[in-house]
């Protein structure tokens, strides 16, 4: 076993930890960190990391961790408004504080809380006691109040790593430690509601103390203090100044009975269980609780069937990567392939982290290697924030290294540990075995197959766009009255707001400069003709630089096709995403976006078949909510937007005009994403009150939709997560947040995820069921983008393939409403979409 950190080596140094302050600081610094059960743990993790950082730098004879007691301190009795301005304690904090105290006890540290006194006073008393007994002292805190304690033997250790010593204090502020409390009394402290002297800031306070040496001497010579306005401020606030001085000075004389030389051994097993419970896998190693890796038991290649595989690629994209190393592990025995590529021929299945990638590379080499168990997929189902092998290894106990054998061992261990965590989770296990694992085989085949690209067409389109971009630039320069760099936001800002005097509608968060974002320009579209031209220029430039020019270079020289990567563990809802290139971001509705789709073509003698789920999210909403009106519309095959408009506006369906239908369509989809009345009023260019009425009439038309949303949010608050029809989860801890904007954002996420995630699950199910039948027919599955599937089939069988695929998608899973799929065929993606 690796030894624990040398916490108690007799080096004559004591560590005092400002527990409450450190916990609060890390609570806000790492907000959003939760376990796979949705339990917030950011303060616990940050506290542990800060402790480790301090302990690694120096050995300590003893460690004391001090917390504020629940009872009010003497300062509250002296000054009723003390700390009155502080925000209420965040609701997640008390539970995490209890966990931090549990951690401190397990580490064997002395934990102190003294009723009637703050942690500062306890720390100060301990520091003076330790100093008097001949110890060196480090106080781990970022609280500036404790700077008054620094001396030759006492230093404040900031969590970021630097020491506050008398020398540091003099260099930074020109103050001696005994002057620090006078300085704090003069300037006050808004965080503690200490008044200080109103109108005196740090610069003036430092100048006064430099001149008079101390607050006591300054007050003795108050009539000689210059300038006059400073003197008058002090006189006007003398009572506040004396109160601030009294409250700022820490007590060093508390009657504490502690033995500085006493130290307890940590509870190793309890600590291990604690860290595993909170999924702090990386901390097991840092606290020395992982068994030292035993020498690997080597065995000859090939490995036995069922072994877990580890591999190392030269780059992330498997179609372009070199296989640098290959190893396998079964029951702790390691098998290394001397020749990685040759070793692939001995495998039938890839079990291990990122199994799909190795299957894709094998396919490139002409080998049919099937991806099997992948701990990444298990971790992703436990918590969709598990998106990388590095993160999964850290979270569940392990390390992602560049060694293929260790990756194989890690895969075996993670698979075992994650299956144990999923015991009893029948829905998640069903998703793993019936959806995600078989889907990885489908995606591996799709990635390896790729799609043909019309490179000559894209090159011609690039020239055309370059000319159009040049023409737009000239038009913008003419309207501006002079040329400038259109790609420089600062120059564009000057032209729009200084020269053309357009209204500045917002500022950037980082710099505070007037924003030239797309949202701002959209709002200014009607204000001046130049804005329309700039927006057009941006769209053309972005699509040219993102797709038209780079796509030809991504065509693989060996296959002559484009091979995007499908990311199975990247989104919070369960949807697939794509990268290298990202095909999800090609605009579907703009003319230029459609022209880019024209570049994706079928092989000679083949046809592309495009299949698109029609209004799948609204159909899923009908099923999940059980709303009879919504269900009836889809069962009777009526147009949902026309029917919604009919109910919203109180007119027969035949009387619904295009504007009414557009309003209803916006509300139908807006409800899914929690669109506010304010946003709806902007979208439809209608008064706010009318938008409120639209939304209310929608919920009157579909009453069970509102009931379902409320039920989903209520369950989410209780359980900490929401789930799809099939049990896929998303943890939403902020559903209980006190801050309204944070809570409302979480609510939008919470009721959208079951709909969007169920739609994603249905698409995945359809792909898994359809894939083997397509292979039997000699057809290929190429792309999955949004709610669409793109296939390639021999022309002679294209109609047969289209009919088969349509049926498979529509019958993916029985719902209360029929699923409907729109089908098209053509020589390229655009014409196949019709």
Swiss-Prot record:
Keywords: DNA damage, DNA repair, DNA replication, DNA-binding, DNA-directed DNA polymerase, Exonuclease, Hydrolase, Nuclease, Nucleotidyltransferase, Transferase. Residues 412-834 are annotated as: Polymerase. Its EC number is 2.7.7.7. Gene3D superfamilies: 3.30.70.370, 5' to 3' exonuclease, C-terminal subdomain, 5'-nuclease, Ribonuclease H-like superfamily/Ribonuclease H, Taq DNA Polymerase, Chain T, domain 4. PROSITE patterns: DNA_POLYMERASE_A. The keyword Nucleotidyltransferase applies. Signal peptide: none annotated. It comes from the Bacteria. Residues 176-262 form the 5'-3' exonuclease domain. One of its GO terms (molecular function) is DNA binding. InterPro entries: 5-3_exonucl_a-hlix_arch_N (IPR020046), 5-3_exonuclease (IPR002421), 5-3_exonuclease_C_sf (IPR036279), DNA-dir_DNA_pol_A_CS (IPR019760), DNA-dir_DNA_pol_A_palm_dom (IPR001098), DNA/RNA_pol_sf (IPR043502), DNA_polI_H3TH (IPR020045), DNA_polymerase_1 (IPR018320). GO terms for biological process: DNA-templated DNA replication; double-strand break repair. SMART domains: 53EXOc (SM00475), HhH2 (SM00279), POLAc (SM00482). It holds the Pfam family DNA_pol_A. It catalyses: DNA(n) + a 2'-deoxyribonucleoside 5'-triphosphate = DNA(n+1) + diphosphate. Belongs to the DNA polymerase type-A family. In addition to polymerase activity, this DNA polymerase exhibits 5'-3' exonuclease activity. This is DNA polymerase I, thermostable. It comes from Thermus thermophilus (strain ATCC 27634 / DSM 579 / HB8). The lineage of its organism: Bacteria, Thermotogati, Deinococcota, Deinococci, Thermales. The gene is polA.
């Amino acid at each position: 076993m690796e030894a624990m950190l040398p916490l108690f080596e007799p080096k004559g140094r004591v560590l005092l930890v400002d527990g409450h302050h450190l916990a609060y600081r890390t609570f806000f610094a790492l907000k959003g960190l939760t376990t796979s059960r949705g339990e917030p743990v950011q303060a616990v993790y940050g506290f542990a990391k800060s402790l480790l950082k301090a302990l690694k730098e120096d050995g300590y004879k003893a460690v004391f961790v001090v917390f504020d007691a629940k009872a009010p301190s003497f300062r509250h009795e002296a000054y009723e408004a003390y700390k009155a301005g502080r925000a209420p304690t965040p609701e997640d904090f008390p539970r995490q504080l209890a966990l931090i105290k549990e951690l401190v006890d397990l580490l064997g540290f002395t934990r102190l809380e003294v009723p009637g006194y703050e942690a500062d006073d306890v720390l100060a008393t301990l520091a003076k006691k330790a100093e008097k007994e001949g110890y060196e002292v480090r106080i781990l805190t970022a609280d500036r109040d404790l700077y008054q304690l620094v001396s030759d033997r006492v230093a404040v250790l900031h969590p970021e790593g630097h020491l506050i010593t008398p020398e540091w204090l003099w260099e930074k502020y020109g103050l001696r430690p005994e002057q620090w409390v006078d300085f704090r009394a003069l300037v006050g402290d808004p965080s503690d509601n200490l008044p200080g002297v109103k109108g005196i800031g740090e610069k003036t306070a430092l100048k006064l103390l430099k001149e008079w040496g101390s607050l006591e001497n300054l007050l003795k010579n108050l009539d000689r203090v210059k300038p006059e306005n400073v003197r008058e401020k002090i006189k006007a606030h003398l009572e506040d100044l004396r109160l601030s001085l009294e409250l700022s000075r820490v007590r060093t004389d508390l009657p504490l009975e502690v033995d500085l030389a006493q130290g307890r051994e940590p509870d190793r097993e309890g600590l291990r269980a604690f860290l595993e419970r909170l999924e702090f896998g990386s901390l097991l190693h840092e606290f020395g609780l992982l068994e030292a890796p035993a020498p690997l038991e080597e065995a000859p290649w090939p490995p036995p069937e069922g072994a877990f595989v580890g591999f190392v690629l030269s780059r992330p994209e498997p179609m372009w990567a070199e296989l640098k190393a290959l190893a396998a592990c079964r029951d702790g025995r390691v098998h290394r392939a001397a020749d990685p590529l040759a070793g692939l021929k001995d495998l039938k299945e890839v079990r291990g982290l990122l199994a799909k990638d190795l299957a894709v590379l094998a396919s490139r080499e002409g080998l049919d290697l099937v991806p099997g168990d992948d701990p990444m997929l298990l971790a992703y189902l436990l918590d969709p924030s598990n998106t990388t092998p590095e993160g999964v290894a850290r979270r569940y106990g392990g390390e992602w290294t560049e060694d293929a054998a260790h990756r194989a061992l890690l895969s075996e261990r993670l698979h075992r540990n994650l299956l144990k965590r999923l015991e009893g989770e029948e829905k998640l296990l069903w998703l793993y075995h019936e959806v995600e694992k078989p889907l990885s085989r489908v995606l591996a085949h799709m990635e390896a197959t790729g799609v043909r690209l019309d490179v000559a067409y894209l090159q011609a389109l690039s020239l055309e766009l370059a000319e159009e971009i040049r023409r737009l630039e000239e038009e913008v320069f003419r309207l501006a009255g002079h040329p400038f760099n259109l790609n420089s936001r600062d120059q564009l800002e000057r032209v729009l707001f200084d020269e053309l005097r357009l209204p500045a509608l917002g500022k950037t968060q980082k710099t505070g400069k007037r924003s030239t974002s797309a949202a701002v320009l959209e709002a200014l579209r009607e204000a001046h003709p130049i804005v329309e031209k700039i927006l057009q220029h941006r769209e053309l430039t972005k699509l040219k630089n993102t797709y038209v020019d780079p796509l030809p270079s991504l065509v693989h020289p060996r296959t002559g096709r484009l091979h995007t990567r499908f990311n199975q563990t990247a989104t919070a809802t369960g949807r697939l995403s794509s990268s290298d290139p990202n095909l999800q971001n090609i605009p579907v509705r703009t003319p230029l976006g459609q022209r880019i789709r024209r570049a994706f073509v079928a092989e000679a003698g083949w046809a592309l078949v495009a299949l698109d789920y029609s209004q799948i999210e609204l159909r899923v909403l009908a099923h999940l909510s059980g709303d009879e009106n919504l269900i009836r519309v889809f069962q009777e095959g009526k147009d949902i937007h026309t029917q919604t408009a009919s109910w919203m506006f109180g007119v027969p369906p035949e009387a619904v005009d295009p504007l009414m239908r557009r309003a209803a369509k916006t509300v139908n989809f807006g409800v899914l994403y929690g669109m506010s009345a304010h946003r709806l009023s902007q979208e439809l260019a209608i008064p706010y009150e009318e938008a409120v009425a639209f939304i209310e009439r929608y919920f009157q038309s579909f009453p069970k939709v509102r009931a379902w949303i409320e039920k989903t949010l209520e369950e989410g608050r209780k359980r900490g997560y929401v789930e799809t029809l099939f049990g896929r989860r998303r943890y939403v801890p902020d559903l209980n947040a006190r801050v309204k904007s944070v809570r409302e954002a979480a609510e939008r996420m919470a009721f959208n995820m079951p709909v969007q995630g169920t739609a994603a699950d249905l698409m995945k199910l359809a792909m898994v069921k359809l894939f083997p039948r397509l292979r039997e027919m000699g057809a290929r599955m190429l792309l999955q983008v949004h709610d669409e599937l793109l296939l390639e089939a021999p022309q002679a069988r294209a109609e047969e393939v289209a009919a088969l695929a349509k049926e498979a998608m529509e019958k993916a899973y029985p719902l209360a409403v029929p699923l409907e799929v729109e089908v098209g065929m053509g020589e390229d993606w655009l014409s196949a979409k019709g």
